[in-house]
UniProtKB/Swiss-Prot annotation:
Organism the protein comes from: Acanthamoeba polyphaga mimivirus (APMV)
Single Gene Ontology MF annotation: ubiquitin-protein transferase activity
Comp. bias regions, Low complexity: 121-148, 192-203
Record region (Disordered): 97-208
Protein's UniProt name: Uncharacterized protein R349
Domain of life (superkingdom): Viruses
Acidic residues bias (residue ranges): 97-117, 149-163
Length: 964
């Protein structure tokens, strides 16, 4: 069975890695950030969903990021997977329409991608101020050699074997990373775009690509620019047009951006796609990210953030990266020098240019929102990635040299001594406990604590150091946590208790603490194997959260509480994000807790609960969102009259004749005459078709549990043309009724339509549905060939095929006949009409399209119940029918649905109505079914306690006659 092997958390989402390296996701999907729609009224995924990514055996998840707009996964082999919401703007993600991609099969045969830029762009942007920023042309003749060398060098370094794959929830089988889709660059501003080559991958900067550089020229940096340009032999055209920044005005230093490509390939619009390969490091902040690859830095911004994030960046050139018609953009930061080495340092990228002795820091600064920032400065002190720290709040860099501290000031673009440590201060630079992108400077002198951050609420001045407190525990302080009504001071002291109160503050000693994490209004920590939550909030419903609380202490402005998590077993590991903690208990059990605010959190309906992977992907492989059975447009409507007194032909024979007689562009309606009763509409039509299909089922198929095989003796009596018409009949019933067939055709038939052999995952899906007990028995032998042979099978795959009744026998003649009949049926099935979105389906989804679910979805049926009438007891009646539906066996529920709707399929867009009729005492009581309107009419006097058992018996007895 699938077991959880690793857990990653970020924001409001959880990523799970299974024992077979499959990836599952759960959490916030409000804006489709997980890559797919799960229903208009459901914004959270409350149990793990397989996202159709299975990593290679030698690959693993390195990092996981999520935000409101998209989700990203970075692997140890350098692959970045992005949810498609990144390029869909967080809007509605539509199911893929395969009919609009005629000829796209050829595109998927090989990967190709060329990146270029039009000469028009080069000419139009030369030395043209954009937003009052002077651009320096690096495409002048003096720079041609350098540009070619850079292009060649990158082309050599970046391999052409990167594959972009479409990954979606439920809708396609796992593909190997070697599979790829063709990518063709189209520069919409280039009239000769049709002639662009297609030999490069996304990341290859081809020679045809024009690099453009933009530098924001600030006060006192003209010398630096001159040095850079002279080193690169660049003609400093426009260098005198220096933009002088008004004193005190904030300006981002980001300024050297070039477009990195434009691609188009065939993929579906749901789920995840492989964005890049061979990526070294990622810097993620809120709703954008940078990544390093082959000593270059790239910037990626989701669709909805383009304008807001790039308004201060120049030059800004539109690029059209198109995946299945959706545009998106990413950018390359091109330095005006050869970068020797780019390092990743927690919250920034760093590179040093030895020729000019300039240090360069690339990160994000926060000014209401986050924006890209490029900081550069010259310094003679020894600086490296280990003694440099970046603050996003002030867009500043700290450098710690011994106990002296230097700080880069954005207002004068220089590195200056910030702390002249003549007093031998103990200087500590730590990430902010709540905002890891922000650094805090703590200085300790005896029992006095200072900081450059104004914790006390006075007017901030970045040039001053503030005294924070005087306390005996100051020498042991390693962090501060300021909450709305109390302060938690983090200390590390072997001689202190875990929690000590002093001077109106809480001192939290982590010396013996194995885990602690600050959340919105408290701290969760692990102490001696028990998990506690320290907060000033009194939790009203502790039982829901499985907590036991007590009042810990009184402070001047608040009361502090401590809550113990009541867990069924000891904690093995803890994973956390800003919104969640996930606990791994002994025995490989996992529990999640949304902890931003225990008292008001409504993120998950269950609030806290156990996480487990659904066994064997039984519920994970079918993607119902891309199923569309109404794929035909009918030009005419033909009315068919059927009299039940005429017994010359049964329903199957009538439907078979009808299939041969009607044009495939004609819609038919059924009018059934049964003695004096006349029925017409969708209900009688569905009932007639299902009756016909069932008659075919009993004659031409051999039934097992769910799966079937052909009755070869009966099929041998049919001509090839007749078998093709049978296939057309099946698809006609599906499309005309907008419903699946009431039977399950042999798996070989679905495989023939699908055009590919089933994967092991897909075979497991079918085998488990056919015989769950037998499947659980053989699953442990999946990776044990010897054990499989002891069970009497050649291989694990052979065992699965036997359970599925698919191509499993040694009888070659039987397999050949089955294959032939499937080909003929599939030809007729396709001839009637195309299957919408078939290219996005995996085999279980196609099987669902044809035959529907294996089991009736009671949850949808109950949620879509609508009861009217009997107003005084309406709620009581509704609850009674819900309990009744839940109590039925699968066969009884099928009979009820057949009576109610003329079909055994439950559709999420249907409303199932129960109408309570009030009549006089003298009126005859009864139950009537209205299949067209999906209604059951029940006389209220039948619902008293004396008749209720009779009502239930009638509901699950096949109905005679109809009301339509």
């Amino acid at each position: 069975m699938e077991l959880i092997s690793r857990v990653f958390t970020h924001g409001e989402n959880i990523l799970l890695v299974s024992s077979t390296n499959k990836l599952y996701i759960m959490g916030n999907n409000e804006y489709g950030s997980c890559g797919f729609k799960i229903g208009t009224d459901k914004t959270y995924i409350e149990s793990p969903v397989y996202i159709d990514i299975k990593l290679d055996d030698d690959d693993s998840v390195k990092a996981f990021y999520s935000c409101n707009l998209f989700t990203m996964i970075h692997t140890s082999k350098g692959k970045i997977y992005l949810s498609r919401s990144f390029i869909c703007g967080g809007g509605e993600i539509d199911a893929y329409d395969s009919e609009s991609d005629v000829g796209s099969d050829a595109e998927s045969d090989a990967e190709s991608d060329a990146e270029s830029d039009s000469e028009n762009h080069t000419q139009n942007n030369t030395n043209t101020p954009i937003n009052n920023i002077t651009l320096i042309n690096l495409d002048s003749s003096n720079n041609s050699t350098q540009s070619d060398n850079e292009s060649d060098n990158e082309s050599d370094n970046e391999s052409d074997n990167e594959s972009d794959q479409s990954c979606s929830d439920f809708d396609c089988g796992p593909r190997s990373d070697n599979e790829s889709d063709e990518e063709v660059f189209v520069d919409r501003n280039d009239n000769n775009s049709d002639n662009i080559g297609n030999s490069n991958s996304i990341d290859n900067e081809s020679e045809s690509m024009t690099e453009k550089a933009g530098i924001i020229l600030l006060n006192e940096i003209k010398t630096m620019v001159d040095e850079i340009l002279s080193q690169k032999n660049i003609n400093s055209v426009g260098i005198n047009d220096i933009v002088i920044r008004p004193s005190g005005q904030y300006v981002s230093n980001m300024g050297y951006i070039t477009e990195s490509g434009s691609v188009s390939f065939h993929t579906n619009k749901n789920g995840f796609l492989l964005f890049k390969s061979n990526v070294h490091e990622i810097l993620f902040v809120e709703e954008m990210f940078m990544y390093s690859k082959n000593n270059f830095i790239y910037l990626a911004i989701p669709f909805k953030k383009y304008q807001a994030s790039l308004r201060d960046i120049a030059p800004f050139h539109t690029i059209n990266k198109t995946k299945n018609g959706i545009k998106w953009k990413y950018f390359k930061i091109v330095f005006p020098f050869d970068t020797e080495k780019i390092e990743f340092c927690d919250n920034f990228f760093y590179t040093y240019e030895s020729n000019t002795c300039y240090h360069h820091v690339i990160s994000f600064y926060k000014n209401v929102n986050y924006y890209p920032s490029w900081i550069y400065f010259k310094s003679e002190i020894d600086i490296n990635s280990k003694n440099m720290f970046f603050s996003s709040d002030t867009n500043s860099v700290y450098v710690k040299d011994n106990n002296n501290v230097y700080k880069y000031h954005n207002f004068n673009n220089s590195l200056e001594k910030y702390i002249d440590n003549k007093l031998d201060l103990d200087v500590v630079i730590v990430p902010d406990s709540y905002r890891p992108m922000e650094m805090r400077l703590l200085l300790k002198l005896g029992i006095t604590l200072y900081s450059d951050y104004n914790f006390n609420g006075c007017e901030d001045d970045e040039e001053h150091i503030f005294e924070i407190m005087k306390n005996q525990y100051v020498p042991h302080i390693i962090g501060l946590n300021y909450f709305e009504s109390f302060i938690v001071v983090i200390v590390n002291n072997p001689n202190m208790l875990t929690i000590t109160t002093d001077d109106g503050k809480i001192f939290f000693n982590i010396h013996d603490i194995t885990f602690y994490k600050r959340f919105y209004n408290g701290i969760v920590y692990l102490d001696n194997g028990s998990l506690f939550y320290l907060t000033d909030s009194e939790i009203s419903d502790q039982n829901v959260w499985k907590l036991t609380g007590c009042q810990l202490c009184e402070l001047a402005d608040s009361t502090i509480y401590s809550y113990l998590f009541n867990l069924p077993d000891k904690i093995d590991e803890i994973y956390s994000s800003s919104e969640f903690i996930v606990l791994k208990l002994i025995g490989n059990k996992y529990f999640y807790y949304p902890v931003e605010n225990f008292d008001t959190a409504q993120d998950f309906k269950t609030r806290c609960g156990e996480i487990s992977l659904k066994n064997n992907s039984v519920l994970e492989l079918v993607n119902t969102s891309i199923i569309n059975r109404q794929s035909k447009s009918y030009h005419t409507t033909v009315s068919i009259n059927i009299d039940t007194d005429c017994t010359t032909h049964n329903s199957f024979e009538r439907l078979f004749i009808l299939t041969q007689s009607l044009s495939y562009s004609a819609e038919y309606s059924i009018r059934i005459v049964d003695d004096k009763n006349i029925g017409f509409g969708d209900g009688p039509k569905i009932e007639f078709c299902e009756s016909a299909i069932m008659q075919f089922y009993y004659k031409y198929l051999i039934a097992h549990n769910f799966h079937t095989e052909f009755n070869l003796q009966e099929f041998a009596k049919l001509k090839p043309t007749e078998i093709k018409y049978l296939g057309s009949m099946f698809h006609m019933v599906i499309c005309q009724n907008n419903s699946s067939l009431p039977i399950r055709l042999p798996l070989a038939f679905a495989v023939e339509i699908y055009g590919k052999e089933p994967t092991i995952d897909e075979l497991e899906y079918f085998a488990c549905n056919e015989d769950e007990t037998g499947f659980k028995h053989i699953y442990p032998a999946k990776y044990n060939p010897e054990l499989v042979k002891e069970f009497g099978y050649e291989s694990y795959e052979h065992c699965l095929k036997t359970l599925c009744k698919y191509n499993y026998e040694d009888d070659t003649d039987k397999n050949i006949l089955t294959k032939k009949y499937c080909e003929q049926l599939a030809a007729g099935f396709k001839r009637y009409g195309n299957i919408k979105n078939i290219k996005q389906m995996n085999l279980p989804t196609l099987d669902y399209y044809i035959s529907g679910p294996y089991k009736i979805n009671r949850t949808i049926l109950i949620n879509n119940l609508v009861l009217s009438g009997g107003k005084d007891k309406n709620n009581n009646y509704l609850e009674m029918f819900k309990e009744f539906i839940n109590s039925l066996s699968e066969n009884e529920l099928k009979i009820l649905l057949k009576n109610w709707t003329a079909s055994t399929c439950v559709r999420p867009d249907n409303k199932y109505r129960i109408i309570i009729i009030s009549k006089s005492k003298n009126a005859k009581a009864g139950i009537r079914f209205g299949t067209c309107n999906l209604e059951i009419h029940i006389d209220e006097k039948m619902l008293d306690e004396h008749n209720i058992d009779t009502v239930k018996e009638v509901l699950i007895t096949p109905a005679q006659g109809f009301k339509d």
